[in-house]
């Protein structure tokens, strides 16, 4: 029995212009949270129809921040899919909540929304759908279900930058939408991620949570 090589990920496209742009940043001496980051957030905001965008060190970080903004914590349950990277469940555990796995649709391999509804209990506070290989779930059904049961939705769209639902870009609607810029994603900054948010207060909280961890003696949450 011959051994086949593992299915390869796409090699990121890094051209000379990209290399030169990185060099410009390194020579500027401002290599983190500088004007290039602000410009990137502005471009993303325009792409998502003017929604608020905040960038962070990873897509994992953005999902945890979204859960904390949504008030998820100890004693709560968050429904998600078992077909995902471990970070999707880990961020739920990190908040003190319990991940509850709903089965997948055998055709799309995405979370089965009928199974999600069957898994809802009085402790359920949120749903994290994962858009496997960039394929979104039925967004109309997802948000109708969330509204029916008063649940928040944190979209794990790590692989879905550029995907659409009924002509609308993923990220241009919804509660919280998390994208990843890790090395094998649609676009990459080596590592990184962004959170697309609904309103200015949520954006303020998204900025404050990481600062509260870095400077706990100066800031309080929320």
Model-found features: residue ranges?
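N-terminal "arm"/small-domain region of PLP-dependent enzymes with the aminotransferase-like
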Residues: 1-31, 35
């Amino acid at each position: 029995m011959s051994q086949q090589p593992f299915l390869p990920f796409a090699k990121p496209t890094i051209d000379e212009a990209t290399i030169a742009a990185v060099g410009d940043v390194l020579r500027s001496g401002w290599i983190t949270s500088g004007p290039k980051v602000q410009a990137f957030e502005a471009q993303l905001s325009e792409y998502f129809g003017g929604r608020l965008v905040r960038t962070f060190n990873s897509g994992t970080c953005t999902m945890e921040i979204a859960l904390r903004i949504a008030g998820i914590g100890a004693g709560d349950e968050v429904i998600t899919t078992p077909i995902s990277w471990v970070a999707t469940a880990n961020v739920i555990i990190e908040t003190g909540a319990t991940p509850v796995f709903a089965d997948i649709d055998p055709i799309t391999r995405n979370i089965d929304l009928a199974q999600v509804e069957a898994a809802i209990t009085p402790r359920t506070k949120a749903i994290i759908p994962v858009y496997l290989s960039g394929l979104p779930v039925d967004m109309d059904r997802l948000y109708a279900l969330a509204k029916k049961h008063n649940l928040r939705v944190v979209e794990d769209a790590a692989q879905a930058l550029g995907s659409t639902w009924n002509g609308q870009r993923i990220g241009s609607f919804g509660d919280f939408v998390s994208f990843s810029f890790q090395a094998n994603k649609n676009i990459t900054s080596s590592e990184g991620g962004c959170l697309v948010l609904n309103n200015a207060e949520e954006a303020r909280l998204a900025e404050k949570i990481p600062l509260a961890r870095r400077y706990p003696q100066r800031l309080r949450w929320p």
